[in-house]
Amino acid sequence: MAGHSQFKNIMHRKGRQDAQKSKLFSKLAREITVAAKLGTPDPAMNARLRSAIIAARQENMPKDNIERAIKKAIGSDGENYDEIRYEGYGPGGVAVIVEALTDNRNRAASDIRSYFTKSGGNLGETGSVAFMFDRTGIIEFDAKVASADDMLDAAIEAGADDVLSSDSGHEVYASQDSFREVAKALEQKFGEARKAALTWKPQNTVPVDDETGEKLLKLIDLLQEHDDVQNVYANFEVSDALMAKMGG
């Protein structure tokens, strides 16, 4: 399994683990509120807010919930969330990045540190593992919107760095600086993307045995279940058999 596939599997597990829609909607709403508060409540003028709304729509979040989250940012009585990135090493020395939005820094740090420690890993300082990842933009489209060749041609013309096409869809990667422009150009050609967001893409992935892989997947599950955690990224590869066993 390639590192790219591992990234997809982690996201798939996130969807499975967040089967409780109330928890998932809460996380999506939090990102929408923060994005609207940091920028403008108009998604046409706020790329981060637009990305958050796209993610919410993909999970069938009701329109009323989305609008309520935006209005919450405009009001003066809404919660204030801090954006925090945690970095550390999981079992087997695998690099892990955790993105969180929290209204209690001490609680979040304590919880996340305990998850790493209990799994046999350790939470490090900011910057301790980020150098092993590239901060990049990802734009996803359904496979039916274009052939692999047409998507590749359009992506190159738009200034993208890489394209991965399969039966499950097209994934276009672009630098952090050009991401918004690439997404806009492709959406003008193919319609709204099913995902458009900044991500941490591992530069290389580390193969791990099933025992270590199981510990890592359990750590990721714990992290993703935490109310404050928005995204988890890691640079490891596991066997398809283990993913099937763990329900990924």
From Swiss-Prot:
Protein name (database record): Probable transcriptional regulatory protein RPC_4807
Family affiliation: Belongs to the TACO1 family.
GO terms under cellular component: cytosol
Pfam families assigned: TACO1_YebC_N, Transcrip_reg
Main location: cytoplasm
GO MF annotation list: DNA binding
Keywords tagged on the record: Cytoplasm, DNA-binding, Transcription, Transcription regulation
Biological process, per Gene Ontology: regulation of DNA-templated transcription
Localization per record: Cytoplasm
Presence of the UniProt keyword Transcription in the record: yes
Signal peptide: none
